[in-house]
């Protein structure tokens, strides 16, 4: 069965055909690093991690780019408001780059624990200012952009294809209460910023032909995707909340600059809800990933996420996560039993299961069906082990399939489940110790015993554990 992908642009499943034979170029929007990752990040990056893994298992060479937004993402997600990283730096009374670097380390620490493989390249917006300026110059030269008072805007009316991804026209966007900023200096209210003149006191700023300023949020992804993957890329992924305005603006500025299709297949993962309600800080149901991983097995969380298709919403509850953890443990129990029991005389042909697994993954990366196949195989293995056992040749074939399916593709099991379980328990024990250390440090600071407070911090740092004081309290992370 050929691989079919649901293309958000055409709104249909399409047979995947790479631009270059045997090679897949993938760009996924990375996090804006102004806070710790949340459960929505986990769903998105685990989903695309499995996409990348399956392409590699299918024999493709994958070039995977995932950016880090460390400047330009304003609080209203468009042209107005304060830079999110600068706002956090102001709240924590520190430098914006320190904020970006700290939360970038925190993000990768969480992703590593969830088994999310690193991208080939993880470019940052601040390291690609020249490329972004060059893209703005091209758009100005071609007549798709205009400069006013040191700000440069993309003229939406100049690009006929604007709205083809989200299905939203300019008027529909405005009527629906879109947060695309409205400034009187724009030719049209829907025009979006490519370059912003820095206000007085704005720390993160660069010299440009138009002003000392900073790039618009949408600009960075186009500039970095095209630098590392070319003017047309195979797959662009991200959360469905980025479809408009972010991805719509990416298409407009990229295709206006090159005259070529920007992305061949758009993939969007759905959102996370909590007990049936959309997750959000304002609703006070925000699930902090780092806190969750301090009490939960990372593999169980990964398994929980993959039980839902990437295009389906994921409803989080403690009960649902408990059930997922129990289901994964049953699967692991079968794998441990299978690996420890000697060969027998009975047969178990894994071929039908392997075929069904491939069919599921080739059907728009249908991980729930793929997991169901593993449970069906688990039942068959237990039945065979209860009877005559499994001959060595069939055992080898089953082991090879499990390595491809459970380990290399889904990332929900390893070849050493005992070590896996031990690592999860170790992190839980470390968290309990850290809570005691943080409480001791908090009490010392409360009594103005700063010498003891600093000594605790320095001792932990020497052990590879970094402490950061935030307005919500102290948080810890493992360095490296």
UniProtKB/Swiss-Prot annotation:
Q: Is Ligase tagged as a keyword?
A: yes
Free-text cofactor note: Binds 1 zinc ion per subunit.
Q: Which domain of life is it from?
A: Bacteria
- Mind telling me which SUPFAM superfamilies this protein's record contains? Anticodon-binding domain of a subclass of class I aminoacyl-tRNA synthetases, Nucleotidylyl transferase
Q: What catalytic activity does the UniProt entry give for this protein?
A: tRNA(Cys) + L-cysteine + ATP = L-cysteinyl-tRNA(Cys) + AMP + diphosphate
Q: Where does this chain mainly localize?
A: cytoplasm
Q: Where is this motif: 'HIGH' region?
A: 31-41
| Subcellular location(s) per record | Cytoplasm
So which cofactors does this thing need?
Zn(2+)
One GO MF term on file is: zinc ion binding
Give a GO biological-process term. cysteinyl-tRNA aminoacylation
Q: Which UniProt keywords apply?
A: Aminoacyl-tRNA synthetase, ATP-binding, Cytoplasm, Ligase, Metal-binding, Nucleotide-binding, Protein biosynthesis, Zinc
EC? 6.1.1.16
SMART domains in alphabetical order: DALR_2
Task: Pinpoint motif 'KMSKS' region by residue range.
Answer: 278-282
- InterPro entries, sorted: Cys-tRNA-ligase, Cys-tRNA-synt_Ia_DALR, Cys-tRNA/MSH_ligase, Rossmann-like_a/b/a_fold, tRNA-synt_1_cat_dom, tRNAsynth_Ia_anticodon-bd
Q: Which residues bind ATP?
A: 281
For binding Zn(2+), which residues are annotated in this chain's numbering?
Answer: 29, 221, 246, 250
The UniProt similarity line reads: Belongs to the class-I aminoacyl-tRNA synthetase family.
Q: What is this protein called?
A: Cysteine--tRNA ligase
Q: What is the lineage of its organism?
A: Bacteria, Pseudomonadati, Chlorobiota, Chlorobiia, Chlorobiales
UniProt lists the gene as cysS
């Amino acid at each position: 069965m050929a691989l079919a992908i649901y293309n958000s642009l055409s709104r249909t499943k399409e047979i995947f055909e790479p631009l270059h034979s045997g090679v897949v170029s993938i760009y996924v929007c990375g996090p804006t690093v102004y806070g710790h990752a949340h459960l929505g990040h986990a769903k998105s990056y685990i989903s695309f991690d499995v996409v990348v893994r399956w392409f590699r298992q299918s024999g493709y060479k994958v070039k995977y780019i995932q950016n880090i937004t460390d400047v330009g993402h304003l609080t209203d997600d468009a042209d107005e408001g304060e830079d999110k990283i600068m706002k956090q730096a102001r709240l924590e009374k520190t430098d914006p780059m320190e904020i970006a670097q700290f939360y970038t380390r925190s993000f990768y620490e969480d992703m590593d624990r969830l088994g999310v493989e690193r991208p080939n390249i993880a470019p940052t917006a601040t390291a690609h200012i020249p490329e972004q300026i060059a893209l703005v110059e091209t758009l100005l030269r071609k007549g798709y952009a205009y400069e006013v008072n040191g700000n440069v805007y993309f003229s939406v009316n100049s690009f006929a294809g604007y709205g083809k991804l989200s299905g939203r026209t300019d008027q529909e966007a405005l009527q629906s209460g879109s947060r695309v900023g409205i400034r009187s200096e724009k030719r049209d209210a829907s025009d979006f910023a490519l370059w912003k003149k820095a206000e007085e006191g704005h720390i993160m700023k660069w010299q440009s032909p138009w002003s000392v300023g900073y790039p618009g949020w949408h600009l960075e992804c186009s500039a970095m995707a095209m630098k590392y993957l070319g003017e047309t890329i195979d797959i662009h992924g991200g959360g469905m909340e980025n479809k408009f305005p972010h991805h719509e603006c990416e298409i407009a500025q990229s295709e206006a600059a090159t005259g070529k299709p920007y992305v061949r297949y758009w993939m969007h993962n759905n959102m996370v809800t909590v007990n049936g309600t959309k997750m959000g800080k304002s609703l006070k149901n925000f699930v902090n990933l780092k806190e969750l991983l301090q009490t939960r097995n990372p593999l169980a969380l990964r398994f929980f996420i993959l039980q839902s298709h990437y295009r389906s919403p994921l409803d989080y509850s403690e009960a649902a996560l408990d059930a997922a953890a129990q289901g994964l443990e049953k699967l692991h129990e079968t794998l441990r039993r299978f690996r420890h029991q000697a060969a027998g005389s009975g047969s178990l042909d894994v071929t039908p299961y392997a075929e069904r697994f491939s069919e599921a993954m080739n059907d728009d990366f249908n991980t729930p069906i793929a997991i169901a196949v593993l449970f069906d195989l688990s039942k068959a293995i237990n039945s065979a082990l209860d009877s005559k056992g499994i001959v060595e040749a069939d055992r080898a074939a089953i082991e090879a399939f499990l390595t491809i399916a459970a380990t290399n593709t889904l990332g929900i099991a390893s070849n050493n489940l005992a070590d896996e379980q031990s690592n999860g328990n170790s992190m839980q024990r470390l968290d309990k110790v850290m809570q005691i250390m943080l409480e001791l440090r908090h009490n010392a600071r409360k009594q103005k015993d700063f010498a003891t407070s600093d000594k605790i911090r320095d001792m932990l740092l020497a052990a590879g554990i970094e402490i950061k004081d935030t307005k919500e309290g102290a948080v810890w992370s493992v360095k490296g």
